[in-house]
């Protein structure tokens, strides 16, 4: 039967079995790992070159990815936005031009309508004035004719009345003379006496 070895007293085959006498200058005490005795690895000088190389590679890869993937997408987005803005500006300019043209056409139509209205009003005033003048002249001519006819009638009636008055006066004078003298006067003497009498107006 094989003898059992105590692991606490029997060294491991991989263990260093060199015995160092007490007080030897090679004697040292192991420090537990995890202490602050070593430097931070990124700050160790012998790793600077490799770190710079990896940093350059990382930046190069990042630049490549940005230039091939991200930047084209950003440029495409910016290009689409620029094209949309340009299209919107062009459309706005076109609409502004159309609005200006419509405003100018409206103002022109308004001016033409005002001119036509003024011309029609002036023509109407002229027509009414000419018609009024014609009516006034016609009325004046009619009134003048009536006035002339009235004056002629008055003169005729005055002449007739005066003739009647002369006849009445002659008859009256003849009756008076006959009453006073007992003899009727002759017609020639009576006419001379009537002619010598002033006419009463």
Curated annotation (Swiss-Prot):
Is Repeat one of the keywords UniProt gives this record? no
Question: What GO terms fall under cellular component here?
Answer: plasma membrane; proton-transporting ATP synthase complex
Q: Where is this region: Disordered?
A: 1-39
- Principal localization reads membrane
Ranges that cross the membrane? 47-66
InterPro entries documented for this protein: ATP_synth_b/b'su_bac/chlpt, ATP_synthase_B_chain
Question: What Gene Ontology molecular function terms does this protein carry?
Answer: proton-transporting ATP synthase activity, rotational mechanism; proton-transporting ATPase activity, rotational mechanism
Which keywords does this chain's UniProt record carry? ATP synthesis, Cell inner membrane, Cell membrane, CF(0), Hydrogen ion transport, Ion transport, Membrane, Transmembrane, Transmembrane helix, Transport
Q: Which Pfam families match?
A: ATP-synt_B (PF00430)
Membrane topology per the entry is: Single-pass membrane protein
Superkingdom of origin organism:
Bacteria
Specify residue ranges for compositional bias: Polar residues. 1-17
Q: Where in the cell is it found?
A: Cell inner membrane
Coiled coil segments of this chain:
none
What is the protein's quaternary organization? F-type ATPases have 2 components, F(1) - the catalytic core - and F(0) - the membrane proton channel. F(1) has five subunits: alpha(3), beta(3), gamma(1), delta(1), epsilon(1). F(0) has three main subunits: a(1), b(2) and c(10-14). The alpha and beta chains form an alternating ring which encloses part of the gamma chain. F(1) is attached to F(0) by a central stalk formed by the gamma and epsilon chains, while a peripheral stalk is formed by the delta and b chains.
What protein family is recorded?
Belongs to the ATPase B chain family.
Biological role: F(1)F(0) ATP synthase produces ATP from ADP in the presence of a proton or sodium gradient. F-type ATPases consist of two structural domains, F(1) containing the extramembraneous catalytic core and F(0) containing the membrane proton channel, linked together by a central stalk and a peripheral stalk. During catalysis, ATP synthesis in the catalytic domain of F(1) is coupled via a rotary mechanism of the central stalk subunits to proton translocation. Component of the F(0) channel, it forms part of the peripheral stalk, linking F(1) to F(0). The b'-subunit is a diverged and duplicated form of b found in plants and photosynthetic bacteria.
Q: What is this protein called?
A: ATP synthase subunit b 2
């Amino acid at each position: 039967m094989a003898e059992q070895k105590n692991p606490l007293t029997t060294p491991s085959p991989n263990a260093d079995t060199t015995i160092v006498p007490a007080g030897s200058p090679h004697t040292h005490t192991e420090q537990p790992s995890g202490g602050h005795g070593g430097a931070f690895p990124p700050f160790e000088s012998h790793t600077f070159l490799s770190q710079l190389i990896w940093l350059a590679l990382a930046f190069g890869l990042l630049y490549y990815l940005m230039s091939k993937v991200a930047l084209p997408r950003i440029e495409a987005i910016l290009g689409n936005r620029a094209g949309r803005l340009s299209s919107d500006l062009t459309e706005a300019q076109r609409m502004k031009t159309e609005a200006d043209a419509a405003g100018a056409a409206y103002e022109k139509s308004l001016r033409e309508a005002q001119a036509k209205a003024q011309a029609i009003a002036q023509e109407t005033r002229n027509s009414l004035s000419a018609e009024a003048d014609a009516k006034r002249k016609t009325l004046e001519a009619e009134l003048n004719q009536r006035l002339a006819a009235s004056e002629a009638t008055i003169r005729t009636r005055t002449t007739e009345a005066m003739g009647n008055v002369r006849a009445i006066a002659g008859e009256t004078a003849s009756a008076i003379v006959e009453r006073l003298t007992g003899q009727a006067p002759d017609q020639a003497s009576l006419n001379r006496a009537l002619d010598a009498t002033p006419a009463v107006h």
